């Protein structure tokens, strides 16, 4: 048993003012038949076995005020693995060792985020829960028990950036929370920004640029799918009483990220970092809209940039960024050497001039994001892929044997488009795994 409360599902569990504008602390007593384990989003204060009823009894406490959408609990036959003094992972029996290896960088991510924000991780412990394959929800930043999809267990730590995203929420989203769902970007745009700062620190700045390019491509695709005139393509949409999940897309994530990158380029990285630090310090434990960030930003601009402050403040067109539909008018320019390498190898395959040995070696050495950029380029040019090229891709790069589910997914879409009958059993097995 497990929960998913974001955006407005907590009201189905118990009577609650189910709005992110309202935060509260809580203390919970749980019971579950032994040998099952019950976890609740908080710090376990006590636990014991009631021998009369054969029930495992636990007391959990959440001392930091949180909104209802972050309430989470799970019960099942679980095992725990320790990553560091404050980080660990819960899984179904048999997956724990694999998960500990996959998420071994969790502590590094926390330390980098603490340095960037100049603010400690306040939640005491950071535990992950690997969900069952029957509910492979990408990631949910529930305090003290972050839920993640089992698809992250690729075996090579190639999907750890998802953990970076959820850890970043410990500051942007969980400490400082969007006041309402039209300000969802205050959670997710800020968190994408921080996720990429973490990846930049661990994997290099060019990886941040590559992720930004891929994110922009996904943003444009989502906006076109929704329709350029759709209300939900605004950074701050009016849901009109509808379920916020009805308008879910990459818009609050990627358009929000691009707005922050635009501001960072305008005032400089060091100044922007100071804005983020002041923002977290001032509004921790609170629910805010964008005006809270705007206030901190403009105050710092006046303090640090003095003579140029009015000119810079006037350059930031908040109404345009927040309420303009469609693709952002301001084009953020990102350049990535990794993207060029990925597209170059893809072109070699399309022109049938790849060196088999070098191609496999290069592909194996790439990070998942670079591999996905390679496959995205092929997908965009799939009209150029003939039967021979498709077989070369499969045989020379061992794409069907890749442990990463995103790589397999992208490859199988190409294989289906090219009617590769030999891949049908692999595709069926992949689909069955997602259903189990």
Q: Where does each model-flagged region fall?
A:
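Acidic/His-enriched low-complexity segments
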Residues: 1-124, 248-250, 267
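Generic recognition of flexible, low-complexity loop/linker segments
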Residues: 14-16, 115, 134, 246-248, ...
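Generic detector of low-complexity/intrinsically disordered segments
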Residues: 15, 38-41, 72, 80, ...
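Divalent metal-coordination and catalytic microenvironments
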Residues: 28, 148, 411
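Hydrophobic pocket-lining residues within nucleotide cofactor-binding pockets
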Residues: 36, 65, 152-153, 416
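Generic domain-boundary/flexible-linker signal
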Residues: 39, 137-139, 422
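Hydrophobic alpha-helical and helix-loop surface patches within well-folded domains
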Residues: 60, 89-353
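Beta/coil-rich, acidic/histidine-enriched accessory regions frequently appended to metallopeptidases
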Residues: 281-435
